[in-house]
Design a protein with these regions (language model features):
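Type III/flagellar secretion export determinants
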Residues: 1-131
Length: 131
């Protein structure tokens, strides 16, 4: 697990790590549609809502770490959800992963967690090493 430190990872998680003022979410769309990305803080309060045009296949959204009022948010864990809306008005949750850079490894009992800045995620949720 220590070999992952310093690497950017693709992670199966609804928690996007805001690191150095940036959070990255990758999502898949079956076709062209509008994607509404909602980000909430640890208290469950809405922080950012962004609407982007999604194309069929892989898409990415890079959050600049600001809230809807333009104020920079503290680095750490935020919860994300993505809802797709087709031109016909049909809505559905879109599958997504998050990207983050591993900054450390911790062990709690038998669990091994990766540190992504101020965010801690289970090692088992890592899908791939991006770089």
């Amino acid at each position: 697990a220590g070999a992952l430190v310093g690497k950017q990872l693709d992670i199966a998680s609804a928690t996007v790590p805001l690191q150095s003022g940036k959070g990255i979410v990758e999502f898949t769309s079956a076709g062209a549609q509008t994607a509404t990305i909602s980000i909430t803080n640890a208290a469950g309060a809405a922080v950012k809502t962004a609407t982007v045009d999604a194309t069929a296949g892989s898409n990415a959204y890079t959050w600049d770490g600001t809230n809807d009022s333009g104020q920079q948010q503290a680095d750490g864990p935020y919860t994300v959800s993505i809802l797709g809306t087709t031109a016909a008005g049909a809505t559905a949750a879109l599958p997504f992963t998050v990207l983050g850079t591993a900054t450390g490894v911790t062990r709690s009992g038998t669990a091994i967690d990766l540190q992504l800045g101020a965010t801690s995620l289970d090692l088992g949720s890592v899908l791939s090493v991006v770089n």
